């Protein structure tokens, strides 16, 4: 099912439909400031397992989307230096790797207690997380075509994944450049993958 949500004024009624789907262990596809992404509630172990299977790479790391930095600090260890980096660069097209706190369920973690965190500069993505009241587990929607790595058209995404997810949010054409990944678990920030933005 394709649900149209406009970024400049997200409809509360449509956001409620998205939240209800997520609270029923559903997976949704939603727009971000980089590429379209799968999302499910951090609280739903069942949905996290389904998301891993849907991606076909069960051991690949998943990322957690937050509404703001205060929410990040509830789930990750954030010292003053890390806080300053996050404040300068978020919201934005970054994935920061941080040490997870005990509030992050084991199902959402890999072998080490590190998670990727995102605060997208996209009003729909942040409105969904805020309305849900908890972070979302997320993973990029990849394209099977090796030339076009990320699918940007929500209608094509719905055709491809509509049967596998509860709904697809149509927030307009997406981007096809992924996030910049920065590891903040060491003494100095380390760029793991160059992406859409430069670290400030």
What are the language-model segments listed below?
Residues 1-200:
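Active-site-adjacent structural elements in enzyme catalytic cores
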